[in-house]
Amino acid sequence: MIHPSIDLLGGKAVQLRGGNPDDCVVAIDDVQGVAAQFARHGELAIIDLDAALGRGDNLALIASLCAQFDARVGGGIRSHERADTLLRMGAKKLIIGTCATPDFLSRYPADRLIVALDAKGGEVVDHGWTRGTGAQVLDRAQQLSAYCSEFLYTPVDREGLMGGTDLEAIARLVAATDNRVVAAGGITSLPEVVALDRMGASCQLGMAIYTGALSLTDCVMAMLDWGKSDGLLPVVVQDSNEQVVMHAWVDREALAFTLATGNGHYFSRSRERHWRKGETSGHTQRVLAVRYDCDRDTLLYRIEQTGRACHIPTQYSCFGDQTFNLRTLEAALQSRRAEALAADTEDAGSYTRRLFTEPGLVEAKLKEEVGELIDAATPREIVWEAADVLFFTLTKLARHGLTLAQVEKELHGRHGRRRAPASSQGDA
């Protein structure tokens, strides 16, 4: 797997030579644009260098990025308060370095934690790579393997120098742990990317992709198994409601177009040509992420669909009707809100328009429906009233320009947040 790195310093995406903040090789102002492009290729790795160096933070920017993209976040996480804050912002996982102790890590689910093994000459260093710990990499990995799901290994003396990474050291770490290993620092060539993938390690790429020495698209292409279907790969296409909407095929060129443009491109086996979804129908696909399976021979496109995905006029998906769920309802409410607020709406007194424009109406309905849910006694009554509460909750979110995805990220953050130490939990 590939994790494009976004290192933040002073609100910019930067790359430092040797981790030295006074030797900045790359500085990009448009962090959001970089993130959108990178996110199509893999889950982002966001590193707050200011926090790591103890000279401020980039929390507002990180919150914005985590609201839009899947990301793991690290840099300066030296307190439970900061860890909790990042999880609530939507970080999928936390990268912990300086505070990677059993006591600190045990407060969180292991599947939400990555331990940073930053090494100089085999010794683990912390505090922004400025302090030696006396611990060796393999010893630290053995000590902490039960408290995390991944290790992020960086030979810091190779970081940003474009001189290649330490494949032998990474192979030793992969062999020594059952945890997933992500390699960073000095990766500069496609053979290295492929070698790491073959040994079971992922790549966190920084300097090489910012300077153009490596292309993220080339990296993805190189890891895939193109030999099973005459140079083609099957693609499962999934919309923002997580409904599978179609199955298609790509060759290298179609995949490259997709990754470069963010539009769904495919290869037609019957017509023997490339095609872009929506080129005649207007029912386009915005590709948010391209992911590949464990065998590297099947792709998943996560998309935002405009109109129908299927060529049959009566079907939304090539597999049938659009699935109804809370996101479907949310989309309908957002559409109704836009219509209700249009200046030329004909039905100014409609109930829908009132819900989105009349102060206090949604809040009053929520209070009423919550009370009825509390009083509901039979299974049927409980389901009925719960549906009303959900409807008006989604209406309130839509009225304020908020989404169900934001609520889900909040719940996901709470799920991964700190647990009380065992000694303080008391008897249940």
Q: What are these regions, as identified by a protein language model?
A:
Residues 8-23, 84-159:
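Conserved anion-binding
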Residues 56-63, 130-139, 163-172:
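Charged helix-capping and loop-helix junction motifs
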Residues 60-96, 103-105, 168-203:
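Catalytic cores of alpha/beta
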Residues 130-138, 202-204, 208-386, 390-428:
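Flexible "arm" and connector segments at domain edges
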